[in-house]
Curated annotation (Swiss-Prot):
<dbReference type="InterPro" id="IPR004881">
    <property type="entry name" value="Ribosome_biogen_GTPase_RsgA"/>
</dbReference>
<keyword id="KW-0378">Hydrolase</keyword>
<keyword id="KW-0862">Zinc</keyword>
<feature type="binding site">
    <location>
        <begin position="166"/>
        <end position="174"/>
    </location>
    <ligand>
        <name>GTP</name>
    </ligand>
</feature>
<dbReference type="InterPro" id="IPR027417">
    <property type="entry name" value="P-loop_NTPase"/>
</dbReference>
<keyword id="KW-0699">rRNA-binding</keyword>
<dbReference type="GO" id="GO:0019843">
    <property type="term" value="F:rRNA binding"/>
</dbReference>
<feature type="binding site">
    <location>
        <begin position="112"/>
        <end position="115"/>
    </location>
    <ligand>
        <name>GTP</name>
    </ligand>
</feature>
<dbReference type="GO" id="GO:0005737">
    <property type="term" value="C:cytoplasm"/>
</dbReference>
<comment type="subunit">
    <text>Monomer. Associates with 30S ribosomal subunit, binds 16S rRNA.</text>
</comment>
<dbReference type="GO" id="GO:0003924">
    <property type="term" value="F:GTPase activity"/>
</dbReference>
<dbReference type="GO" id="GO:0005525">
    <property type="term" value="F:GTP binding"/>
</dbReference>
<keyword id="KW-0547">Nucleotide-binding</keyword>
<feature type="binding site">
    <location>
        <position position="260"/>
    </location>
    <ligand>
        <name>Zn(2+)</name>
    </ligand>
</feature>
<comment type="similarity">
    <text>Belongs to the TRAFAC class YlqF/YawG GTPase family. RsgA subfamily.</text>
</comment>
<comment type="function">
    <text>One of several proteins that assist in the late maturation steps of the functional core of the 30S ribosomal subunit. Helps release RbfA from mature subunits. May play a role in the assembly of ribosomal proteins into the subunit. Circularly permuted GTPase that catalyzes slow GTP hydrolysis, GTPase activity is stimulated by the 30S ribosomal subunit.</text>
</comment>
<feature type="binding site">
    <location>
        <position position="247"/>
    </location>
    <ligand>
        <name>Zn(2+)</name>
    </ligand>
</feature>
Length: 293
């Protein structure tokens, strides 16, 4: 049986990309019975007699799954944050990074609008960028208005399934349109036909850019730590995770415990104070979260 990847799901049809092209498929009735919903990004087994009539027979296990947009098996997230208008926001960036690390997705930090900064702001942003690079993150500088700077991003997309995410007003859609200019019409098309408040569901589609696939809908529209527990949080901060193995107590929360290697690393300047401050804020937020029943 042939295998492929679902690149679009719309009105009960699943569009499966495989070696010979794309086949329009329906899901088997057993999926509904077992409450399995195939998602864009799923690797599947399918059967088809012709390109427009096929059936998805099996959905392979997922390595991760996002709710908004509904997509599975994401390799990386391109996190778009502006240097100015709005100003660079490390607190919000850390929130995105926690969510992405929790879903086992590789983050790539892309700081846009670098063509608009003055010298003082450039120094500030570059200082933050160096901090994040030392933590092990890829950090890129781009200007949405120049295709040359967007070309910096393209090699990172090769062979991967990527989502674009980030704060509002930083040009996520503009970036997608520069990567694939023909998307602009499609974006306008969707927004004119699908109005908010109506009973319509915006579909997500994976679009080919080089040998990579990029979701055409920005990811992580919800920034709440709904599923993350305090004990998970350390593992979403790479530098805290590295230091925590030297804490005296297993399960150390790095707040008030004695002989905490994380707090020692903060005092020694090995972990930045603003990252530790954000960690503590997120712990408090998780602890204040109302329990779900």
């Amino acid at each position: 049986m042939p295998e492929g990847k679902i690149v679009k799901a719309l009105s009960g049809f699943y569009y499966v990309q495989h070696e010979e092209g794309i086949t329009q498929c329906r899901g088997r009735g057993v999926f509904r019975k077992n409450k399995i919903t195939p998602l864009v990004g799923d690797q599947v087994v399918f059967q088809a007699d012709n390109p427009s009539e096929g059936y998805v027979l099996e959905v392979f296990d997922r390595k991760n799954e996002l709710v908004r947009p509904p997509i599975a098996n994401v390799d990386q997230a391109i996190l778009v944050f502006s240097a100015v208008e709005p100003d660079f926001n490390p607190g919000l960036l850390d929130r995105f990074l926690v969510l992405i690390e929790y879903h086992n997705i590789k983050p790539i930090i892309c700081i846009s609008k670098m063509d608009l900064v003055d010298e003082k702001m450039r120094e500030t942003v570059e200082s933050y960028a160096n901090d994040y690079r030392e933590m092990g993150y890829d950090v890129l500088f781009t200007s949405i208005n120049t295709s040359e700077s967007i070309d910096i991003l393209k090699p990172f997309l090769e062979g991967c399934v990527s989502v674009v995410a980030g704060q509002s007003g930083v040009g996520k859609s503009s970036m997608l349109n520069v990567l694939r200019p023909e998307l602009e019409l499609k974006t306008n098309d969707i927004s004119s036909h699908l109005g908010r408040g109506k009973h319509t569901t915006r579909h997500v589609e994976l679009i080919a850019i080089g040998s990579g696939l990029v979701a055409d809908t920005p990811g992580f529209s919800s920034l709440d730590f709904i599923d993350i527990e305090v004990e998970d949080l350390t593992y979403c901060f790479p530098e805290l995770k590295e230091a925590s193995q030297y804490c005296k107590f297993r399960g150390c929360t790095h707040l008030s415990e004695p002989k905490c290697a994380v707090k020692a690393a903060v005092e020694e300047g090995k972990i930045t104070e603003y990252r530790y401050k954000n960690y503590k804020q997120f712990v408090e937020e998780i602890r204040e979260r109302k329990p779900r029943y």
